[in-house]
Each structure stands twice: as structure tokens, then as C-alpha cells.
Swiss-Prot record:
SUPFAM superfamilies: Kazal-type serine protease inhibitors. It comes from Homo sapiens (Human). The record marks G59, L60 as: Reactive bond. Residues 1-21 form the signal peptide. GO terms for cellular component: extracellular region. This is Serine protease inhibitor Kazal-type 14. May be a serine protease inhibitor.
């Protein structure tokens, strides 16, 4: 019994992993490869209570073109502009315009 426990544990772990990965679907890693699908938040977050400096967009350089034909340094900056324009500016395509 003592020798079969590690084998049983390993098989159980593999089975659970396979079931969970098939149920939860594929994982999406950042940065994505190929076509970038940008999903921006629909409303601003009130951070007036925060006294520090807020940098919502890190220094990632991944050029992206907006529907206004302006190139943004990364999807985060495009999302900020989308919020400012009340959704009129959206993702158009990967890369520079």
C-alpha cells in the first residue's frame, strides 16, 4: 500500500489537471501573439482618495492603431483615450497606423 500511494497521488493529480484545463478553456498570456483584442473598462474608477501618483499604463511598447488613425504606444493608452472620448475611439488594428 505504501508504494502505491505515490503512484495513485500522481495519477490523481494528472487527472484533476486534465479535467480542470478542459473545463476552464485555453489560457491567454500577456503579451498576446498575433491580433490583439483590446477590452477597455466602461467607466472610470474614482481614485480621488489616493494621494500618490497613479500610472495606469506601464512602459510597455506595443504600438496599436485606434479608429481615429492615431498610433498609441500600448493598448492601455488606447483605453485611456477611449474613456476620454466616451467610447468613440476604439481598437482598429495591431501596429502603427
Amino acid at each position: 500500500m505504501a508504494k502505491s500511494f505515490p503512484v495513485f497521488s500522481l495519477l490523481s493529480f494528472i487527472l484533476i489537471h486534465l479535467v480542470l484545463s478542459s473545463v476552464s478553456g485555453p489560457r491567454h498570456w500577456w503579451p498576446p501573439r498575433g491580433i490583439i483584442k483590446v477590452k477597455c473598462p466602461y467607466e472610470k474608477v474614482n481614485l480621488s482618495w489616493y494621494n500618490g501618483t497613479v500610472n495606469p499604463c506601464p512602459g510597455l511598447y506595443q504600438p496599436i492603431c485606434g479608429t481615429n488613425f492615431i498610433t498609441y504606444d500600448n493598448p492601455c493608452i488606447l483605453c485611456v483615450e477611449s474613456l476620454k472620448s466616451h467610447g468613440r475611439i476604439r481598437f482598429y488594428h495591431d501596429g502603427k497606423c
